[in-house]
Amino acid sequence: HGPRSDKNYEVKINRAMRQKALLVTLSRKYKDGEVIFVDSLEMAAPKTATAKAMMLALGKSFSGLNKSKNAAYIALPSRNAHTLKSFANMGHVQAGALADLNPVSMLEAKYLVIADPKAAIETLSKKLSTKAAGGAPAKATVTKKAAAKK
């Protein structure tokens, strides 16, 4: 007999709450000085040695960036296979596309390294826009209804 694994513990979180959690986490990291903006992290070939050299260069300015566990999450503007493979062999760093950024991965790491800030802002504004959440027109409809009643 024993325990059965048929229970599903998955919880659905609506889009507005996910966006709010991402915004709160981003703002907290920024206020704590744990967001690092880098011009580019593009790599021509998947080389862990190059990725390690980049992290060591960044680590001179930020203590704890080269620690042994959960030091940084690198958010790339787009999925670059060479860059992702280069950082995949490093145990203390996670890398992923900015479009896939979530609060859990940001909270697991001490620092958030964002490559190409201009593209990052565009990607985040698309991800966090109110139109994507289906929210903005609510005020306009309420105003029209109120005007129609008068």
PLM feature spans:
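Extended polybasic, low-complexity segments that bind anionic RNA or targeting/receptor surfaces
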Residues: P3-K150
